[in-house]
Amino acid sequence: MTVETFNPKQTTTLETPAKTLEAASADLANAESATGNRIGFVSLGCPKNLVDSERILTQLRIDGYEVTNSYDNADLVIVNTCGFIDAAVEESLDAVREALEENGKVIVTGCLGAKENQIREVHPDVLEITGPHSYEAVLKHVHKYVPKPEHNPFTSLIPQTGVKLTPKHYAYLKISEGCDNRCTFCIIPALRGDLDSRPAGSVLDEAKRLVESGVQEILVVSQDTSAYGKDKGGRTDFWNGMPVKQDITSLARQLGKMGAWVRLHYIYPYPWVDDLIPLMAEGLILPYLDIPMQHASPRILKMMKRPGRVDRQLEAIQRWREICPDLVIRSTFIVGFPGETEEDFEMLLDFLREARLDRVGCFKYSEVEGAVANTIAELISEDVKEDRYHRFMEVQAEISAERLARFVGRTMDILIDDVDEEGAIGRSFADAPEIDGMVFINGETELEPGMLVRAVITHSDEHDLWAELVDADAEDDIEA
């Protein structure tokens, strides 16, 4: 099975359609199995989709199937698709085509699966199609075409955390499905439905299992993380015999007590986001906010059906930084939205210059089938979108370099992700995996992934940091 890896430097958001590590898990590929009932798996899209893939893979292993990273050895291939933007749809259809050509027996699931007719039109030979988070339906179809093998569950035990496609030291924790917002450029509610929050006790149980298994960083994800619990109507859940309010602040507070890094993604700018900042200042959760703002022109924001008071957003950013000076803010924006004028775009650049955001990603508007935005105003030409994209990134590169430079000379905790012949590569609290920068510790080849080390930052650019390990005894002397 050929696995293409999306370059995180090219796109800087977790929503990026990308083939993930379906073949990178050696534990799966090399899992002992005498059944011969082998399932191939291709996972595309964002971390929310990755979590869905992990759940399906876990159930496959529980049922006794072997998961293989080879088309040739697979009795059937599952493709978990993304359908967020047209580029993702194209990539998903290409992945289905490849699976059909290389294997012939394919089940399609995921976001694009909600558009069965579109898939059937291109690939009529697909065996079955299900929509997103249709775990039981996927397993039912697998059982139909590849009978559930007889196996002894005690000889192939599954970890309590289930199958994970991420490195062992970090994991994504999905706390809800769906979204109640109706942004005109987005079709997620049509694909995944309205907000459906997991019970707080279930979320915390999973988080506890992850930490007990050695996970050192929990990345909290959903379509609308800050809306967690809104659909519960204020009802309280229970965990470890104690009541837990079902809202994002209460959940984050409990997660922060587990001893792992807790990083929040996809924070919609609701007023109660203010309540999260003190938790960051206290060190309970990482001082990191992934808060997609999308634009800064009130007119464009209104057309997007997004919060339109940019002055309030700037005031909030200033307020948050006063409470938590270490706060790192990541955001994403869209340029070339239908009807965007040069004046609208200049407002966006002015906002960047004033807000001084740490990490920023930019998308050129892409038509999404079924999105309201496609027809609300005149579409912007590709040449104009390309020009605005480069001007946007040029402005932000200078700001990002300035924000990263403040870490030079500072001693920080670095979580090691990889080690090669040149040294160790890790991340600080300011860096989410795959989408942000890295911390390079040259020459330290004896470190191992998952280690948390102390290092002093020696150099920075607009993306990354360089550091040297700190001698523990020397640091103790300084602190004394």
Curated annotation (Swiss-Prot):
UniProt cofactor(s): [4Fe-4S] cluster
Start and end residues of each Radical SAM core domain: 165-402
Cysteines joined through disulfide linkages: none
Location in the cell: Cytoplasm
InterPro entries xref list: Elp3/MiaA/NifB-like_rSAM, Methylthiotransferase, Methylthiotransferase_CS, Methylthiotransferase_N, Methylthiotransferase_N_sf, NA-bd_OB-fold, Ribosomal_uS12_MeSTrfase_RimO, rSAM
Reaction(s) this enzyme catalyzes, per UniProt: L-aspartate(89)-[ribosomal protein uS12]-hydrogen + (sulfur carrier)-SH + AH2 + 2 S-adenosyl-L-methionine = 3-methylsulfanyl-L-aspartate(89)-[ribosomal protein uS12]-hydrogen + (sulfur carrier)-H + 5'-deoxyadenosine + L-methionine + A + S-adenosyl-L-homocysteine + 2 H(+)
Residues that coordinate or bind [4Fe-4S] cluster 1: C46, C82, C111
Gene Ontology MF: a single term: metal ion binding
Alphabetized Gene3D superfamilies for the sequence: Methylthiotransferase, N-terminal domain, Nucleic acid-binding proteins, tm_1862 like domain
GO annotation, biological process: tRNA modification
Cofactor-binding details, from the entry: Binds 2 [4Fe-4S] clusters. One cluster is coordinated with 3 cysteines and an exchangeable S-adenosyl-L-methionine.
Family: Belongs to the methylthiotransferase family. RimO subfamily.
Protein name: Ribosomal protein uS12 methylthiotransferase RimO
Organism expressing this protein natively: Shewanella sp. (strain ANA-3)
Classification lineage: Bacteria, Pseudomonadati, Pseudomonadota, Gammaproteobacteria, Alteromonadales
